[in-house]
Amino acid sequence: ITTRLVGSEMCIRDSHHPDWEQRLKKMLDMFLQLQNPDGSFPRKFHDDFTVVDGSGGSTPSATLPLVMGYKYFKDKRYLSAARRTAEYLEKELISKADYFSSTLDANCEDKEASLYTATATYYLSLITNGTEHNHYASLTRKAAYFALSWYYVWDVPFAPGQMLGDIGLKTRGWGNVSVENNHIDVFIFEFADVLRWLSKEYNEPRFSDFAEVISTSMCQLLPYKGHMCGVIKVGYYPEVIQHTNWDYGRNGKGYYNDMFAPCLLYTSPSPRDA
């Protein structure tokens, strides 16, 4: 379950599909069964709830649908569970600046853990007030600063004849994935909105300025008629974009790695849209 799934279900009530609401509630209730006493969620598990990977680095991915579930169903159990995730995130990730293992295939520091942590506490700040709101906002800012350390502020050179060089890709504004998976990708989802919100919340224009750099840079490889960027379908965005000599076993620097499925870009509503 992800924010994209929960977000898409936000319109279901108006569309008169109560069966989908019940399915969604069932998934959220299953989430509650998976949560550990310390507030974390396992990274991988079987459908019988047997834990395959108990690493808590993916915990913020659970916060988002729990908050959305609370906003939609008004069930305080989901909000309570979301708050408990934030306690874990603050203690184990944010306070230690140790954002680890959010990507499914890396056991190391990675961008997504900090990116999703910032988004998770952002969601909580949107549905709280006063001291609690301020606390979550502060956590969001700390996590966002760390996430931004993964983003390029220069353009990696490509050799003549490499596809990305021929396309004219500028890496400024793109984020590296992890220490283990040393490539850039388009995985950002709501992070630019988080940065814009932080800019207003703290009167800090650097956040919104860099959100603009990210947003415009991400559009470089979006395929459309007359600008297909080596992709066969309009609207499909390649996920693994190889800007280093890191050996992924396919194509090499300056090309896409077609062993990985492309991401299809779309938008998700936030709690304030509910």
For every predicted segment, state its role.
Residues 142, 188-196, 200, 204-252:
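Exposed, low-structure sequence patches enriched in small/polar residues
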Residues 4-8, 13-17, 26-30:
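Alpha-solenoid helical-repeat scaffolds
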